[in-house]
Amino acid sequence: MAAKILIVTGDAAESLEVLYPYQRLREEGYEVHIAAPTRKKLQFVIHDFEPGFDTYTEKLGYTWPADLSFAEVDPGAYVALVIPGGRAPEYLRNDLELRKILKAFFDADKPVAQICHGPLLTAAVDSLSGRRVTAYPALELDMQAAGATFQDAEAVVDGTLVSARAWPDHSAWMREFLKVLRSKAPVN
């Protein structure tokens, strides 16, 4: 039986940051589940960079069903965790069930991949202090406030934690995460 990886997300997550790791990890042979506050069809969004705007723009993206709710997750059944960005982490960081999941993965030193605004979740459970991370560049101060050393790079690896800035960095992010997975949490 293939090892299982959990993606935690919600409405307004960045479509590419959910679906790229979902597909890439399945290609590697992992079983991948998506968890959200409740089992429902999630509405993802697409962020883009357009001329004349000082920040990214947002449009409706894909919809995708959540396989299970946060309350249904048994962290012990999963070998790794993926935390996409978008706006979802802004409100998900207040979800107590999700906070329990995040703490369990970090307490067990399991591989965690986070991208864009995803590090807001790991900061909310005090799991970044003393670590090197990257995130969407506008979160540099948030990362420093969480005790992390912010690095503006495509992908940053600190032990079992792999972070990236945003979807343009997918290749470097997944390449580094797969190295960690092959070492710490192989498919079989």
Kindly label every feature range from the protein language model.
Residues 1-108, 112, 121-130, 140-188:
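Extended, subdomain-level signal for the structured scaffold at the beginning of enzyme domains
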Residues 133:
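Anionic-ligand binding patches
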